[in-house]
């Protein structure tokens, strides 16, 4: 990562010595007066079931063999007979919101053979896979049936002989009204003492979407956390001011920090961070870097691009000695890793999350350097949702309790609260596009924020892999696509020159221009050295912006 060598000062030295220290604060001391209205993320719930042995009045039941589950029956009447497919709920179910569905015992009287009752959900999918074997005279079909009061409607019927049963179907919304139930049965024709045997059982699941009730969350602004960190590094004394320039990136202007303990509503919630984590987050996510004003004791975060002004602030008329040019290999990277550290949710929804790490190759094979633009703060929507779901359920520590999350939210003067920003972005390839949030913090937007710096060594980033959902597209642009970078801030060339001109410019953001051996050079100050006790000139090390021949 590029760092411009700043003039040595007491404030810079203080920050350097304490930047890695992690500080903790009570959220109540830093929080905004108004809270974030978190209106939740729609997620999948998965009810898993397994079959069990059942005898429906067979006088000569077959015994199971190996891993078989056997359903025995006897149908002595003419026509078809209907039996409930014996299924029991598994402890491997992932039910995050039990208020929109109730798992049932399908053989309990009054449940109409149903395995689940719905009270308000938008989508349901039934999936199954297992092997089945039947007796010689057993002719059967498996049915998925919607139960609405006394009315029963067959949604899907699977006719099958011996072999693998692998089906899935979506339940139409018309059958998902409050109180509707879902049952699975099988139909057999006439025959005495018949059976079907199930083996090699893989799964039988009912997945449904749900969205929980909204909650309010305490939030902290980035500039408030910055000033708290500066005060802590200054021995809890006032005197150092932190500022974040606004009006450059709306993703930052509308950014709010959510401490993990606030998401869980833990009493006396705390927030944990070091200055280094804050700085790394600002740089990776927004391309913002700090400038230090020792005279005014001020740390200002602004976009890196603003530190490279294309106006000439000094012309060196005479190069006295030590002219050398080289390629700065530290500015050349073969890979770029951007995003966030991957988190394992142990959930079916985890595969939907896309705010993890994406890896790109630059086409450069001269080095094996990797540019890591990894945010230590988290933007994963599912991480926030799962923490909120833990509210009131337990008080034990969670491995995510020390984490910091952030969201994009605007203050609503009508409702007097912060509300998530979802407008302005069209997202596809996720479970619930309508409720998804933080899409503006995807790895692709992080690359855009750092585009001109990446452009120094790579005009094109070629997508290689992702730790998360790589099928997402935002505003019609795929997250797994290649990315062209911006106009480079400078080149990888580095020029060292010594001059007897002792007039060092006070503005280090502009260009230094000089001519040497029929070429004109311009570049930005990377480092200067001036030994006043010895008359040996001023030594400049420049990051070259341009080289042109002198006609």
Residue spans for each PLM region:
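Surface-exposed cap/loop segments at beta↔alpha junctions
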Residues: 1-88, 167, 175-240, 538-551
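Short beta-strands within extracellular/lumenal beta-sheet-rich domains
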Residues: 78-119, 166-168
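An acidic/polar, Gly/Ser/Thr-rich interaction patch typically located in mid-to-C-terminal regions
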Residues: 1, 93, 242-551
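Extracellular beta-strand-rich recognition modules
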Residues: 116-140, 167-170, 177-190
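Long, low-complexity intrinsically disordered regions in eukaryotic nuclear regulators
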Residues: 85-94, 123-125, 129-134, 152
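Solvent-exposed serine/threonine-rich low-complexity stretches and specific carbohydrate-binding patches
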Residues: 152-163
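Trp-centered recognition loops
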Residues: 162-169, 275-276
């Amino acid at each position: 990562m590029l760092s411009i060598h700043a003039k040595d000062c007491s404030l810079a030295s203080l920050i350097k010595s304490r930047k890695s220290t992690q500080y903790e604060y009570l959220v109540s001391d830093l929080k905004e007066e108004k809270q974030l209205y978190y209106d939740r993320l729609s997620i999948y719930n998965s009810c898993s079931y397994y079959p069990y042995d059942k005898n429906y009045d067979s006088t000569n039941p077959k015994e199971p063999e190996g891993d078989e589950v056997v359903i025995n029956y006897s149908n002595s009447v003419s026509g078809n007979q209907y039996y409930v497919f014996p299924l029991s709920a598994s402890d491997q179910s992932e039910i995050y919101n039990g208020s929109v569905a109730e798992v049932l015992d399908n053989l309990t009287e009054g449940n109409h053979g149903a395995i689940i009752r719905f009270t308000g959900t938008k989508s349901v999918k039934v999936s199954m896979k297992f092997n089945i074997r039947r007796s010689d005279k057993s002719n059967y079909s498996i049915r998925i049936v919607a139960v609405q009061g006394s009315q029963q409607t067959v949604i899907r019927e699977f006719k099958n002989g011996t072999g693998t049963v692998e089906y899935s179907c979506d339940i139409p919304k018309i059958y998902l009204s409050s109180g509707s139930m879902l049952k699975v049965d099988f139909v057999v024709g006439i025959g005495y003492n018949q059976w079907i045997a199930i083996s090699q059982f893989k799964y039988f699941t009912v997945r449904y979407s749900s969205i929980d009730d909204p909650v309010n969350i305490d939030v902290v602004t980035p500039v408030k956390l910055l000033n708290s960190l500066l005060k802590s590094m200054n021995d809890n004394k006032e005197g150092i001011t932190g500022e974040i320039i606004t009006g450059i990136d709306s993703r930052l202007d509308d950014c709010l920090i959510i401490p993990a303990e606030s998401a869980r509503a833990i009493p006396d919630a705390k927030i944990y961070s070091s200055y280094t984590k804050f700085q790394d987050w600002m740089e990776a996510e927004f391309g913002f870097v700090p400038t230090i004003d020792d005279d005014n004791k001020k740390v200002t975060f602004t976009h890196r691009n603003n530190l490279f002004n294309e106006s000439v602030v000094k012309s060196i008329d005479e190069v006295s000695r030590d002219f050398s040019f080289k390629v700065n290999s530290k500015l050349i990277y073969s890979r770029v890793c951007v995003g966030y550290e991957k988190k394992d949710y142990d959930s079916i929804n985890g595969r939907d999350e896309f705010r993890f790490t994406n890896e790109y190759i630059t086409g450069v094979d001269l080095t094996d350097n990797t540019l890591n633009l990894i945010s230590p703060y988290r933007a994963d929507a599912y991480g926030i949702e799962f923490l909120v779901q833990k509210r009131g359920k337990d008080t034990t520590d969670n491995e995510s309790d020390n984490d910091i999350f952030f969201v994009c939210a605007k203050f609503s003067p009508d409702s007097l609260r912060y509300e998530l920003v979802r407008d302005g972005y069209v997202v596809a390839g996720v479970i619930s596009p309508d409720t998804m949030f933080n899409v503006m913090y995807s790895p692709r937007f992080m690359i855009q924020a750092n585009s001109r710096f990446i452009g120094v060594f790579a005009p094109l980033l070629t997508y290689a892999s992702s730790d998360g959902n790589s099928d997402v597209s935002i505003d019609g642009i795929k997250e797994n696509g290649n990315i062209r970078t911006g106009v480079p801030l400078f080149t990888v060339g580095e020029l060292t020159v010594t001059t007897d001109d002792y007039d060092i410019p006070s503005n280090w953001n502009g260009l230094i221009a000089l001519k040497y051996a029929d070429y004109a050079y311009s570049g930005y100050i990377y480092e200067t050295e001036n030994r006043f006790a010895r008359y040996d000139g001023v030594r400049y090390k420049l990051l070259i912006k341009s080289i042109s021949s002198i006609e």
